[in-house]
């Protein structure tokens, strides 16, 4: 069994991306219950969670919310690949407690990857 639930993360140099977020990003505070990304909008940031926790929520056709993922301090948060390709998110990412997140514009990250 992989060491991470999302096994792709084992193939990414997370130290590099953490350093990018901390050196290039803006530290933003989000109160509990605030959206990092709202379903139906394009995610503006890729973030490194300095403190706090967030949940990924998708909605069924009747509007019922379903938690499909979680992020905690020391992890990354974004709608991948939607944020990089400027596509509308199918889910919301919502803080479950107050959070401090280093936010890097997803447009800048996409430019650096080309």
Q: Residue spans of the language-model regions?
A:
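Cytochrome P450 core scaffold surrounding the K-helix E-X-X-R motif
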Residues: 57-63
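Cyclic nucleotide-binding regulatory module and flanking cytosolic helices
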Residues: 1-31, 81-82
């Amino acid at each position: 069994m992989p060491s991470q639930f999302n096994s792709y993360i084992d193939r990414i140099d997370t130290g590099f991306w953490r350093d990018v977020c901390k050196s290039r990003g803006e530290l933003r505070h989000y109160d509990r219950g605030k959206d990092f990304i709202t379903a139906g909008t394009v995610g503006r940031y890729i973030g490194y969670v300095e403190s706090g926790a967030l949940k990924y929520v998708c909605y069924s056709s009747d509007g019922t919310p379903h938690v499909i993922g979680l992020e905690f301090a020391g992890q990354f948060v974004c709608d991948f690949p939607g944020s990089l390709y400027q596509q509308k998110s199918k889910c919301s990412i919502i803080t479950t407690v107050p959070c401090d997140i280093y936010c890097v514009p997803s447009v800048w990250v996409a430019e650096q990857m080309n």
